[in-house]
Amino acid sequence: MGNCLSSSDQKEAKDRSVAIDKQIEQDSRQFKKECKILLLGSGESGKSTIVKQMKIIHQNGYSKDELLLYRLTVIKNLVDSAQAIVLALRKFKMEPEMPENRENVDVILQYRVDADPGATLDHPMARKVDSLWKDPIIPAIMERSSEFYLMDSAAYFFDNVNRIGQADYVPDENDVLRARSKTTGISETRFNMGQLSIHLFDVGGQRSERKKWIHCFEAVTSIIFCVALSEYDQVLLEESGQNRMAESLVLFESVVNSRWFLRTSVILFLNKIDIFKQKIPKQPLSKYFPEYSGGPDINKAAKYILWRFTQTNRARLSIYPHLTQATDTSNIRLVFAAVKETILTNALKDSGIL
């Protein structure tokens, strides 16, 4: 049979075919670019700090007005930490060695932070906190920090108390990364990472928030699960008798074996490696996990904790571990370069290309 189409018809058909192919390719590329990442982990594991790092790295950081929004949180964190030290001194029947600090502890304990977002820290109070932090008794109380609740950033804020106590104090990005407030509900952060458009969902880590999670996120590309390595000797804020690492293991087990995530990969951030390195020589891991036999070796201790987490993976999900320090922007930038490859691979698998 002869060709019934004219050359103009053939050209039109070819152009239409090319346009359709181009649209299919564009749709496919768009599909691959949209990646939903679920950020999970127990309270104070570093999830919100990761979100802040994404803003710094991928969204041009914080404006002055945005930084000022954190001033009240920083001041509250500082005062709460100072009061925690005073209460610990009383709990352990210890007293400051410097006479002025013996007088200051009551004033510190009674101090209340003004709830006004524009409030500042009284300069005399800043001096009292600074004096207490420099008291010779403090190293002895910090040796026992696993026996009472003290936020990880306490020492950082104490070291910067005179700057924070200035009337014109504006937090910097390091302050923001260390500022701690409870995350409730679900927040979404969107940013581009190379050819990927990331939708990062941060879920409240405290126990009362967990029931809100899982059913919403069946279609996520990957889960980033944060574990604070340094919590192996700490107790829960919500339940003071419960070991925080044990709680994280229970949560991780429930996530990796959930029917909602059977095709999801898990990126495991073993976070707060900096605090972990300082702590392991002073607080033996074997005291809290008796079967550990690697002594004060940092690598062996981290590998043991990783092993404990991977042992819970009965669903045989792909797990990609990374040692992280969420407060260190350069570290998180490097880690996310590797994470990007993992996410891209999983997106390609989801789209049927791999």
Curated annotation (Swiss-Prot):
One of its GO terms (cellular component) is cytoplasm. GO terms for molecular function: G protein-coupled receptor binding; G-protein beta/gamma-subunit complex binding; GTP binding; GTPase activity; metal ion binding. Residues 324-329 are annotated as: G5 motif. Signal peptide: none annotated. Residues 33-354 form the G-alpha domain. InterPro entries: Fungi_Gprotein_alpha (IPR002975), Gprotein_alpha_su (IPR001019), GproteinA_insert (IPR011025), P-loop_NTPase (IPR027417). A lipid is attached at C4 (S-palmitoyl cysteine). Gene3D superfamilies: GI Alpha 1, domain 2-like (1.10.400.10), P-loop containing nucleotide triphosphate hydrolases (3.40.50.300). GO terms for biological process: adenylate cyclase-activating G protein-coupled receptor signaling pathway. This is Guanine nucleotide-binding protein alpha-3 subunit. It comes from Ustilago hordei (Barley covered smut fungus). The lineage of its organism: Eukaryota, Fungi, Dikarya, Basidiomycota, Ustilaginomycotina.
